[in-house]
Amino acid sequence: EYKASVLSLREKYREQIDIHLGMEVECYQSEWEDLATYRKDMEYCILGQHQIVLNGKSSYDLRNGDELKQYVDQIEYACYHGLCDYIAHPDACMWIYPRIDDGVRTAAARIAEISAKYDVPLEINCGSGVRTGLSQYEDCVRYPYPVCIFFEEAAAHGCRAVLGLDIHDPKLFFTDEYINRALSVVEGLDLNI
């Protein structure tokens, strides 16, 4: 139904705007066949691993290096199999993660290595993470995401980056506030945006 609707709108408005067929996907190895089918049908597949479940926890509720490793393993699996065109909010795992520790540094470096190896851009997300505002964590005050360490690693590895407006209210398209907040996190980094 989604595909038919988008293709119908593309045809109807072809003289006025370009409409592309795409969707945000999550990578679960048990769903490999469905993911491969979606990938063939879509012009764009955006990987958003925000609903991965790890021992009863979503990626918004990770608290240790082992859980971060599992999160990154899912991202690597998707990129290895060519299931995505870019990685949405690669740092969403930091939503409540308490501090920037060795597990975070390892995850950030691995995600940058994966991005560079498979030439899959990383999204600087201008949505939920910055809309909630700055929060106090054990070691600093920061947005839940984007998180600077991830994009320091991206810059060091020469990764491409994209800005993503992950918003759920069309009125938010009329403000640059959240874009500016997200860009403030990566200011001064030599990113290929």
List each model region and its residues:
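Charged catalytic cores and adjacent phosphate/nucleic-acid-binding surfaces used
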Residues: 94-95, 99-193
